Structure formats: structure tokens, C-alpha cells
Amino acid sequence: MLRIPVKRALIGLSKSPKGYVRSTGTAASNLIEVFVDGQSVMVEPGTTVLQACEKVGMQIPRFCYHERLSVAGNCRMCLVEIEKAPKVVAACAMPVMKGWNILTNSEKSKKAREGVMEFLLANHPLDCPICDQGGECDLQDQSMMFGSDRSRFLEGKRAVEDKNIGPLVKTIMTRCIQCTRCIRFASEIAGVDDLGTTGRGNDMQVGTYIEKMFMSELSGNIIDICPVGALTSKPYAFTARPWETRKTESIDVMDAVGSNIVVSTRTGEVMRILPRMHEDINEEWISDKTRFAYDGLKRQRLTEPMVRNEKGLLTYTSWEDALSRVAGMLQSFEGKAVAAIAGGLVDAEALVALKDLLNKVDSDTLCTEEIFPNEGAGTDLRSNYLLNTTIAGVEEADVVLLVGTNPRFEAPLFNARIRKSWLHNDLKVALIGSPVDLTYRYDHLGDSPKILQDIASGNHEFSKVLNAAKKPMVVLGSSALQRDDGAAILAAVSSIAQKIRVASGAAAEWKVMNILHRIASQVAALDLGYKPGVEAIRKNPPKLLFLLGADGGCITRQDLPKDCFIVYQGHHGDVGAPIADVILPGAAYTEKSATYVNTEGRAQQTKVAVTPPGLAREDWKIIRALSEIAGITLPYDTLDQVRNRLGEVSPNLVRYDDVEEANYFQQASELAKLVDQEFLADPLVPPQLTIKDFYMTDSISRASQTMAKCVKAVTEGAQAVEEPSIC
């Protein structure tokens, strides 16, 4: 197992050997034979004893070892005997040698593990009944399996003061066994050197040295990798036991990455959200917003239909009354008098149902909140608005040019991939835009969009770096396209991507042009033919406007005529609901089986974990019921039929967990030459500059008290939200 050089891992200066991230297969002639309890196994040179054992299905106990972290070798729980060797060895750190016979269950191995476990438990408080890790604790499981049935420790146990590292992670450091997983995660994966050890021997402690908030958008992952109960979730504390909850596999919609998650529920309530393994998207990590914003699902919810009365106040009503009012308006208008805006958390089923509904009244004014330039290729070519290299593809790149984006807070798991490749490979990163605090070193080329013109013409110094690259990537943030010169920026990036693709001589399957989206619904909406941006609605104000989860504030009441009838359909009383004449309560992503498409064009499904609150219903069902009352019944009654319709409109939307290869980059580049737009003098400034801007970006996270505490802790310090411990 390759160790990351200490200097590089801790302060990010040196480079570790190539090939750590994605290794190629080894020729059979180079394999060596070893034996695990007498069973032969062929492994690559450099394979550790632990990896060789796992290859034959033999699980070796461990605390400090983690597959995605560097090897520490400090817990000693993985000690095994090597036949004819004088001493037991640490399986996680010892490379195998040809002909070794590894004895995993010999008396010597058992005695060594028992001794290690005895030392680990010597200072452990043994407070399992009040520990949130109970039931899913490695220390519990391994002490039961490999430990002794009695203790010889009679002395007093040490006690360690708990650290306040913010409103998300609860620390009970007396339980800590100094495995250093959290420290290695912080420095290697998160790229934040906030955690470390102080003292030595019995006085060693893990903490931040100077008490401060753990400033990372990935901080919650240290809860998952902690093998004991030293680091647990503050919002989840004392709420449920793991065996009491029902687990539902789903996906996250807090950003456009589409991280795979597990939703744990009990009695119809979301108790917590955990990561689910997906090697091509989020590996086994999730962002803090994904993990902790679930309390926003319980607050500010729309649970019953509402209508605005004669006094201008919103009052509760029945579904029949609300739908009848909207149906009456729908029957009164047609064509451009009817329009719709889709928000950032809307699923593909609702998008296609709304599209079909408006098409029934001869309207095609269907817009998204996010802008995407229509000039040039616009959204006609799918490759023009996708992360074509894919998220995992970053690990193969040797140069990445970031334009107008801060991936650390717009797409934390994509940023973690960039850091992973930068740390283990010779990845060079450059940024055009406002300087931001990324978790890797980068060359800041400036913040003017005119730099793109210089690079495209070959007059910029960085042009040489791009042309010399073997697998270059250009990543354009969708936030840069919200500007008035968005078309010029997109055209310049398209031109750069095409030129360096030719210069690099990369294989045809390597894609250079990439768009990094910020919201979960955008790609599906563009696939279904929605118009990006609301300019069409501003120019031709409708008489009837549907806001489908539109809470981005892209349009206000002042932008519309006084007689415009607004229908809001969504799950939170956020920005869109207060301006509506009728409110139709919808279901959140944990309450429906729905399709979302991430920034790389991968379709995935959420699953029903809990039922919608009150009288709320799934969005496509509401639209289907409305169509029937309006006398323009949509031709589907079940979810499967809606998905069949999805497949008719855009087949890639029902090819789940598959990234359809996008092409026509040369055509897009040629069309980009037709764009006649000047660059603005304004600098490229991403909307999420600091971690404070990361926590509250949509209707769910804005309703979350936990996310509000995070913002307060960042601005005022962790002590501002300190809560008294109850254990």
C-alpha cells in the first residue's frame, strides 16, 4: 500500500508517485504467489498482507486502516503471524513477499490482537448505552470477536476534555483511540489541516490545538470513518438507534453532482442521511449540506392547498377548490398567455408532465431559473451543457482550467476528485475568476473574462501549458453563464476546448469541454426542451404563470402585470409561495420516487423514504389531476407510464446510472464563432465565494436550523452556537 509523503499530505507541497488513483492491471508474469492460511493467492508486488488476505475473503480486524487514506499503522489491531517469522507484523503496512504463508488465526495472532484490544480498552470509558455509535461501532464488534472476556486493568482511567469544533460534529474525546483517521481525512481528502495530535503517550489528544470550528464542507465524513464514538453527529445525538431505523437508498439533490445516499427513517420522519458508495460519483463521501440539511424537510413545509382571498391573504382550502380555480384559468388562456418556470429541485417526471400540460394549451414558454446562452449551439447540442469528462474522469486529467467557478462550494465532491488527482498525480490546476480558497494549489490567471480571448488566440502564457497537455480539461461554472456576456464566455471556452483537444492529440473519447452545474434539475430540464432563463417571460408577461418549485427569486411580482395569476407548486414556503394566488403542496425528494440527472448527464432515481406531510402530493400527480379537471387529460396514470413518456421525449433520461457519450464538439465550436457579443469589464465572481455561502442555497437548506447554525458559527465562531452537553 502506497504511503502518501508526510510533507505532501500535511501541507500539500510535494508530489507522490503517479498511478495511485487508478492503477492499470499487472501482467500475470509479474504476479507473486503467497498463501493465506495455506490457501494460494496471486497478488501484485507491493500488495500488503491485509490486501492479500481480503483477496481470499479473510477479514483482518483494523481501526486505523482505511482504503482511501494513507497507511498509519498505529492501532496494531491487524497483527498477524507470518510462518517462520520471529514476530507478528502489522498487516496494513507490511508488503507481502513471494512464498509467504500468512497465518491469520494462529494462537500467536489471536494473542497479539487480544493484547492490543486490552490496551485500547484500558482508557476507554465503556459507555456504550449512552453512545450514539452503539450498534454500529467497530470497537464493540471487534472487542466482542477478538478481545478477552475479562479485564486486568485496575488503575484509574484517563479523561479528556471534549472539543467544540462546530455545530455538526459532537466530540467525546475520552472515547478516542488515536487511530488518526479523522486527521488523515482532513489533510488528505478534505484538504484542511485543522486536526492534529498534541502530547504523547497517555497524554496524546486529537483536536484543533487552538479551539476553533472545523472549517470544511466535508467535515461530517469524519463521523463515518471514526471507528468509535469519539466523533458523532450533533443534530442526530440521542434521537435513534441504527436498528430502529429503516434505510432507503436514494440520491442527493442539494447540488448537481447527484451523490448517492442512504436515508434513515423512523415513524415517517427522516432521522439522518448517510453516504452510499458510488465509485464514479461520490465514492463514499457526501457534503455537509447533503448530510445535515434534512431538518429543513420538517420546517416551513406546505402541507395543504392555499388560495388568496379577497383581502389578499393566503388561506387553506381543499384540493378540489384549488385545482378547480387553476383549471378555470387554464381554460381561459392559451399560447403565450400561459408560462411556467421550473426550480432547482424539480424532478424529470414533473418537468415532462408540466411540459405536456402547457403544450396542450399551445404554449411552449417553459423556462428554467438558471440561464444558459442560446447563441451558438446553445442547448441544441447536449455536449454543450454537460460535464463531458465525467466526475471520475478528472483523475485521468493532467491539466484542469477552471473558469468562473468555485467547485469547493458549488460541487464539493467534484472538488474532492480534483484534489485527489492533484495530490496523487501530476495534475496542474489554473483558475480564471475571483481568487478562492480551494483545497489544492492553483495558478490564478486573473479574474477578467478577456483572458479567455487571449488563451483562445494563443497569446497567453497558459496556452502553452494547455497545448502541451495530454488530457486537458476546461471546466466552466454555470454561474459564469448568468452574466450578460455569458454567450461570449461560452463561445470562448468552446473555442479553447476544441483547439487544445486537437493540439493535445488526445483520443476521441477524451472530452475537454465541461460545464459544472449547480442545481439538480437543470440538465433534465434542458434535455426536455425547457428554455434557460426567464427573459422570455419578462418580455412577454403571461396571464397565467406556473412556478414549479421556483424559489430562486428569478422573477418577482413587480416583473409581472397585476392581473397575472400565479400558481406555485412546491414543498416549502420559501421565495415563490408568498407571491402566488394558489399554492399546491408538493413532495420533497425523500418523499417520492423520481428521476434526476446530474451535471455529467447521468440519470438516477430517488426512492420514497417517507410519505409527504399533510395533503401534499407528488408533483406529476398534481399536474395529472389538474389536466383532468381542465378537460385536457394527460395520457398517463402511473409512474411507469410517465417514465415511458420521458423515454419518448429524451431516451437518456431513463437509462439509469449510465453516462451517454456526448459528441459534436467541433460543430459546437464552429457555431460558437457566430456569437457576436463583447466581454464585460466586470470580473468573474462565483456566487459561493466562502464557506458561509455554501450552507443555505435552496428552499430545503434555507429552512434548516442546522445550516443556520453553521452560518452563525462561521461568522461569529463555534462558541456562538455552543450547546450544553447532556452526557
Swiss-Prot record:
Binds 1 [2Fe-2S] cluster per subunit. Binds 2 [4Fe-4S] clusters per subunit. Residues 245-301 form the 4Fe-4S Mo/W bis-MGD-type domain. It holds the Pfam family Fer2_4. CDD domains: fer2, MopB_Res-Cmplx1_Nad11. Its EC number is 7.1.1.2. GO terms for cellular component: mitochondrial inner membrane; mitochondrial intermembrane space; mitochondrion; respiratory chain complex I. It is an enzyme of class 7 (translocase). SMART domains: NADH-G_4Fe-4S_3. [4Fe-4S] cluster 2 binds at C176, C179, C182, C226. Keywords: 2Fe-2S, 4Fe-4S, Acetylation, Electron transport, Iron, Iron-sulfur, Membrane, Metal-binding, Mitochondrion, Mitochondrion inner membrane, NAD, Oxidoreductase, Respiratory chain, Transit peptide, Translocase, Transport, Ubiquinone. It is a peripheral membrane protein. The modification N6-acetyllysine is found at K84, K499, K709. One of its GO terms (molecular function) is NADH dehydrogenase (ubiquinone) activity. Gene3D superfamilies: 3.10.20.740, 3.30.200.210, 3.30.70.20, 3.40.50.740. It comes from the Eukaryota. One of its GO terms (biological process) is mitochondrial respiratory chain complex I assembly. InterPro entries: 2Fe-2S_ferredoxin-like_sf, 2Fe-2S_ferredoxin-type, Mopterin_OxRdtase, Mopterin_OxRdtase_4Fe-4S_dom, NADH_UbQ_OxRdtase_75kDa_su_CS, NADH_UbQ_OxRdtase_ferredoxin, NADH_UbQ_OxRdtase_Gsu, NADH_UbQ_OxRdtase_Gsu_4Fe4S-bd. PANTHER family: NADH-UBIQUINONE OXIDOREDUCTASE 75 KDA SUBUNIT, MITOCHONDRIAL (PTHR43105:SF13), RESPIRATORY NITRATE REDUCTASE (PTHR43105). Core subunit of respiratory chain NADH dehydrogenase (Complex I) which is composed of 45 different subunits. This is the largest subunit of complex I and it is a component of the iron-sulfur (IP) fragment of the enzyme. Complex I associates with ubiquinol-cytochrome reductase complex (Complex III) to form supercomplexes. Interacts with MDM2 and AKAP1. Core subunit of the mitochondrial membrane respiratory chain NADH dehydrogenase (Complex I) which catalyzes electron transfer from NADH through the respiratory chain, using ubiquinone as an electron acceptor. Essential for catalysing the entry and efficient transfer of electrons within complex I. Plays a key role in the assembly and stability of complex I and participates in the association of complex I with ubiquinol-cytochrome reductase complex (Complex III) to form supercomplexes. This is NADH-ubiquinone oxidoreductase 75 kDa subunit, mitochondrial.
